[in-house]
C-alpha cells in the first residue's frame, strides 16, 4: 500500500504587544451559551502581501468564521479601506459606519529562509481597542493551516471557547455506481480541502476513528470477506490488525487516553462489547447478552461508556461504567437510537434516531434527559463531534440522490452547512485540534 506522510509544521506563536496592547477588560464578545445568536458583523480586508498569498489566507479565515454561524463578514465591496497596515491604528469610523463590530487586519511576509511570517490584529471597532495580536512562522505549503489557526484565535478571543478550524476529518470516500461502489479511507481539512486517500484497494472500509494523539486511525475493513478492525499509522501508512478474533469485529473507537480500543465482537447471532489493551493485546469483555451490543463510545474522562443495544427489542442507548458494570438504559423516546458518541465536553451524547420513516441527528444529556433533534431527513447518520463540543458533522443521503454527503450543524440546529468533497462521502470522524 502506498504510504502517506503528514505534513510537518512548525508554527511559532509570538504575542504582538506594544502600542496597541489590549487592556484586561472584556471588549466585544459572543455568548454562545445563549442558544441561537445573531451573527456578529466582522470585517476582514485582504491581508497585505507581495504575491497575493495574503488575500488567500484572509479568505480562508473569513470562510471559517462565516461557516461557524457566529460571524457575518462585511461585503468587501463596501470597504472604504481596502487594505490596512497592521502597524498602524485603523480609522475606526470607516468600519463602524459599515456596522462592523470587529476588524481583522494582517500581513504575510516571506523570511530569508523561505518561511512565511503571518501576523494579524483583532480590533474592537466601537471601543477602538486591539483585542488580540499574534504572529506565526511556517513553510509556504502550510498556508491554509495558518489561516485556520488565525480563525481559531479570533473565535476563541470573541467567544471564550476553543475553536475547531485547525482540525482534520477522516471519512469514507465513495465512488462508482450504487451496484459497484468503491469505498476508500480518506482524510481532509475540516473545511473539505486537502483531500488525500489513505487506502487504495477494492476492499470495503467503514467507521474510521481518530486516536487522541491524531497520529493513528482505527477502522473496519472487509478483506477476504472477513471484517477486521485495523490500526493505521498516518505518518508511515503502516497498518496492523487489532486482534485476530474468530467472528466479525466492528465499530472500533479509541479510549480517551489512546491506550485501548473498544469494539464490538460478533459471536453466533449476538455481539458484545470488548476492550483491547494496545500494549498487551489482552481483551476484556464488558457486556454479555443474547442481543446486539455495538457502537461504544467513551466519556471524555474514560469512566463511562455509551453504546447501543437491541436487548429491549429495539435499538436503544445504554450507559455503563468502564468496567461494564451499571448498565442503564437512557433513551425512551419513540423509534430506535443508534451511533451514540459522547461530547468532548462530557455534557451531551449525540446519536442517530430513526422514527416515522425518517432519520434524525440529535443530542441528549448522559442521563437521557433533554433530548433535542437538530436535523431530520430521509437518511441522516453517524454524528461526530468537533473538539470544542459545539458542532457536529454527519452524513446524509437525500431521497433519490446518488450517494451520501457530509454536513455540519451546530447545537442550535439552525446553522447547517454542506461540507463539499470531491466524491460521495460517509462515516466522518473529527480529529482533536492539531498541534
From Swiss-Prot:
Its main location: periplasm. GO terms for cellular component: periplasmic space. The keyword Phosphoprotein does not apply. Residues 1-26 form the signal peptide. Keywords: Cell cycle, Cell division, Periplasm, Signal. The keyword Cell cycle applies. SUPFAM superfamilies: TolB, N-terminal domain (SSF52964), Tricorn protease N-terminal domain (SSF69304). It is found in: Periplasm. One of its GO terms (biological process) is protein import. Part of the Tol-Pal system, which plays a role in outer membrane invagination during cell division and is important for maintaining outer membrane integrity. Belongs to the TolB family. The Tol-Pal system is composed of five core proteins: the inner membrane proteins TolA, TolQ and TolR, the periplasmic protein TolB and the outer membrane protein Pal. They form a network linking the inner and outer membranes and the peptidoglycan layer. This is Tol-Pal system protein TolB.
